[in-house]
Amino acid sequence: NSAYEYQKTDEFRCMRISHEPSIWVGDRGTWQFMVNTSKDYNTNDDYGLGTLKANFSHDNEVAKAHYYKVSFDGNGGDAANSQIELTPTSHGAVVRFTYNNTANKSVIFDCANGGSRTEYSGNTFKTYSDHTGNGSKRMYIYGEFSETPKGTKINDRKSIASFNSNRVTMKEEFGA
């Protein structure tokens, strides 16, 4: 018996990384990111993952143990005309974001259930997640983009990075 349930809705909210997933005591050290084509770093709108969603179909995804890909079509909501590809590594992931000539080419980071603060420097970023319980430690995240963002904005525990290119790769590593 497992608590896992195949997603029944057509809403895709984000990719979530968990330091230690558990159906018994809950995830600890979670951190989320999402491709976005509706917001730019200059926006004054709320851009937290709780306010964003992308329409998707399981017909537009490839899900394997070593590779995940989902494409959002022109009706894809906040991620219209974009795609995420993810390959896990031993302590991180390599992610590619593809944008189909949209005006806004952004990635949004959020730590919805804990403390976090993202710092950008050139094409790198570092952040942490304080979403912990049972005395667990903070999870640290370090990432590197294939290009320097054209602009970033940080707001409490969420941030946005916007790009010029139609394809951006992000390498990230995390640990306690």
Regions inferred by a protein language model and the residue ranges of each:
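Accessory carbohydrate-recognition regions in carbohydrate-active enzymes
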Residues: 1-176
